[in-house]
From Swiss-Prot:
One of its GO terms (cellular component) is cytosolic large ribosomal subunit. InterPro entries: Ribosomal_uL5, Ribosomal_uL5_bac-type, Ribosomal_uL5_C, Ribosomal_uL5_CS, Ribosomal_uL5_dom_sf, Ribosomal_uL5_N. This is Large ribosomal subunit protein uL5. This is one of the proteins that bind and probably mediate the attachment of the 5S RNA into the large ribosomal subunit, where it forms part of the central protuberance. In the 70S ribosome it contacts protein S13 of the 30S subunit (bridge B1b), connecting the 2 subunits; this bridge is implicated in subunit movement. Contacts the P site tRNA; the 5S rRNA and some of its associated proteins might help stabilize positioning of ribosome-bound tRNAs. It comes from Synechocystis sp. (strain ATCC 27184 / PCC 6803 / Kazusa). The gene is rplE.
């Protein structure tokens, strides 16, 4: 079954962006490449229970098993040794990416307290967007009673756009609620 957001992109957004930016070839039109969801464990890296809960929460939110990221080198100031788990990460592509973005845009972001839209300034200069989420409770899949601690996560939306303007137009067309 094709995702709702993917169908919307193929049927309406693609022709609109092609006309707006004057592309001759349909493959020049910016599209979503991947979405990465990352959570750094911080001081919880010493705690195996925190790692397990982060793994299950990210798996529940994204629908895909996260990979544990490990420290590349020891840093005494942070009490980290080489090979210690320092975070969890998921890379979403194709159907799961569209499903996650659909839930993020239409369900999770509107549930943030005092939400007025996301910052339009978080583009990286190449059309990719990064978003920080402060608490995992905004996702309807997470049960309030099962979490041990409120933790945030970073969501990076990677597009094939060449400029921030193209990336912003693509995400706005997909329904991303940018602050005016």
């Amino acid at each position: 079954m094709t995702q709702r957001l993917k169908t919307l992109y193929q049927e309406t957004i693609l022709p609109k962006l092609q006309e707006e930016f004057g592309y001759k070839n349909i493959h020049q039109v910016p599209k979503l490449t991947k979405v990465t969801v990352n959570r750094g464990l911080g001081e919880a890296s010493q705690n195996a229970k925190a790692l397990e809960s982060s793994l299950t929460e990210l798996a529940t939110i994204t629908g895909q098993k996260p990979v544990v990221t490990r420290a590349r080198k020891a840093i005494a100031g942070f009490k980290i040794r080489e090979g210690m788990p320092v975070g969890v990460m998921v890379t979403l592509r194709s159907e799961r990416m569209y499903a996650f973005l659909d839930r993020l845009i239409n369900l999770a972001l509107p549930r943030i307290r005092d939400f007025r839209g996301i910052s339009p300034n978080s583009f990286d200069g190449r059309g990719n967007y990064s978003l920080g989420i402060r608490e995992q409770l905004i996702f309807p899949e997470i049960d309030y009673d099962t979490i041990d601690q409120i933790r945030g996560m970073d969501v990076s939306i990677i597009t094939s756009a060449q400029t921030d303007e193209e990336g912003r137009a693509l995400l706005k067309a997909l329904g991303m609620p940018f602050r005016s």
